[in-house]
């Protein structure tokens, strides 16, 4: 497959950070925002939530774009195997960070590449273990007022000031923590026959 015949590639996400990450690959892509219910199911394990939502996002966009390769992604933050969602408010964000300080949190960055030509879906859950610094309440409050990460799982906006919350990060994919694991994605694209280098 040459670069002239490759299928449309669509990122099913409203996240500017995922868009920026995908643009690093220098391949043409479009962006579409999926409209799905992101509520976890009763009794659903965190990794299962992330994988299910990444696939639902890809399927929602693929239904509107026949023959395209669609990327769906979702991230779930967990501590002691309990999901830590998007806080929504300053008070909830502060409570999350107080709970996580000095502890190691797992981020499940789920990825789905749905091939609209064949219906094949490749899925992966890339885990990142992030150890938080033991910061004071005043430092946590200052971070929240500067960054306002109320739409980020676990209140940790690591693509910005949130990186200062962390003491250590362990992952097989350095971009997974920001929300789009590029090592896994490029492997999926190659499996789908997509010419990542344009040849």
UniProtKB/Swiss-Prot annotation:
Family membership: Belongs to the Maf family. YceF subfamily.
Record GO terms (molecular function): nucleoside triphosphate diphosphatase activity
Sorted UniProt keywords: Cytoplasm, Hydrolase, Nucleotide metabolism
Cofactor: a divalent metal cation
GO cellular component, one term: cytoplasm
Species of origin: Cupriavidus metallidurans (strain ATCC 43123 / DSM 2839 / NBRC 102507 / CH34) (Ralstonia metallidurans)
SUPFAM superfamilies the record matches: ITPase-like (SSF52972)
Enzyme class: hydrolase
InterPro entries assigned: ITPase-like_fam (IPR029001), Maf-like (IPR003697)
Chemical reaction(s) catalysed: N(7)-methyl-GTP + H2O = N(7)-methyl-GMP + diphosphate + H(+)
Major location category of this protein: cytoplasm
Name of the protein in its database record: 7-methyl-GTP pyrophosphatase
E.C. number(s) listed in UniProt: 3.6.1.-
Function: Nucleoside triphosphate pyrophosphatase that hydrolyzes 7-methyl-GTP (m(7)GTP). May have a dual role in cell division arrest and in preventing the incorporation of modified nucleotides into cellular nucleic acids.
Annotated site residue numbers, Important for substrate specificity: 17, 75, 159
One Pfam assignment: Maf
Record keyword Hydrolase present: yes
GO biological process, one term: nucleotide metabolic process
Cell compartment(s), UniProt: Cytoplasm
Active site residues of this protein: 74 (proton acceptor)
């Amino acid at each position: 497959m040459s670069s002239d015949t490759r299928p449309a590639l669509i990122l099913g996400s409203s996240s500017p950070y995922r868009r920026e990450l995908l643009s690093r690959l220098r391949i043409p892509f479009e962006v579409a925002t999926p409209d799905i219910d992101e509520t976890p199911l009763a009794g659903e394990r965190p990794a299962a939530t992330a994988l299910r939502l990444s696939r639902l996002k890809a399927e929602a966009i693929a239904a509107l774009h026949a023959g395209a390769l669609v990327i769906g992604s979702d991230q779930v933050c967990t501590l002691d195997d309990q999901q830590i969602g998007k806080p929504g408010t300053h008070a909830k964000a502060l409570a999350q960070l107080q709970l996580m300080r000095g502890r190691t949190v797992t981020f499940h960055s789920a990825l789905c590449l749905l091939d609209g030509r064949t219906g094949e879906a490749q899925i992966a859950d890339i885990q990142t273990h992030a150890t938080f610094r033991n910061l004071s309440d005043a430092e946590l409050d200052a971070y929240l007022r500067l960054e306002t990460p109320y739409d980020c799982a676990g209140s940790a906006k690591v693509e910005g000031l949130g990186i200062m919350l962390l003491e250590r990060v362990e992952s097989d994919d350095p971009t997974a923590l920001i929300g789009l694991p590029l090592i896994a994605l490029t492997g999926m694209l190659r499996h789908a026959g997509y010419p990542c280098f344009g040849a």
